[in-house]
Amino acid sequence: GIRIGESRGHKMGIEEAQKRMAVLYVKFHFANRTSEFLQVCRNEKYGEKSTFFRINKNEEPAFLYAYMNALKNVKIEEKTNILNLGINKADEFEIIKEMVNEDIFKQMNFVGVDYSLSAIDFAKKRFPYENFNFFNHDINKLNELNLKKSDLIISIGTLQSSSLNFKLLFMDLIQNYLEDKGSIILGFPNCRWINGEMIYGAKAANYSYSEQSVLYKDVYFCKKYLQQKKYRVTLTGKNYLFLTATSIK
């Protein structure tokens, strides 16, 4: 009878074929595990063990002042359903907790989404309340979560991630996740972090110095789109540019 391998012009014994199959299996298994490991590394780029996670933006006056003004601008005490994309360890929710009356805070519903499992686990422990829901999920597949519309969407330094289609995602958020007369707060980083210190000026690829044309291009796109949808738009801040939009419909 024909043995394994004869169809390729040579004869291969059963034992040799089994060895080769075993080698191929090991290589495939190793490649698959390596792929899984790299995916976890990407997901945990801003996770609990990262340098970014140890940064406390709430202790930076340049961030805190502009963010609190944005919350005042949207009348945060009147909001009931708040969605935060790229929530990380939920620093933005902590400021809201400090700003509003305790009884009002308990009536608000908070939803946070982040790609980092360790960050989401931390946020859940930080806010173990019934009116908080946190999801470890890819923002590109937000529709899989079946979220109800929110009257405030917050996203700080997330939408410009290289893994996201900025313009399409932004328009999808306005059309499908924001209530008709809701508000939105977007934070665009115009800084970089060096040894835990906030340094003014965003670092762009292929430049050895701060170059901000891409930053302002994205900000202008959002501003123009929201104005067409009947929103009043303000731009504030320095190290973080805060785009705040409130409905005038």
Language-model segments: which ranges?
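Conserved class I S-adenosyl-L-methionine
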Residues: 78-89
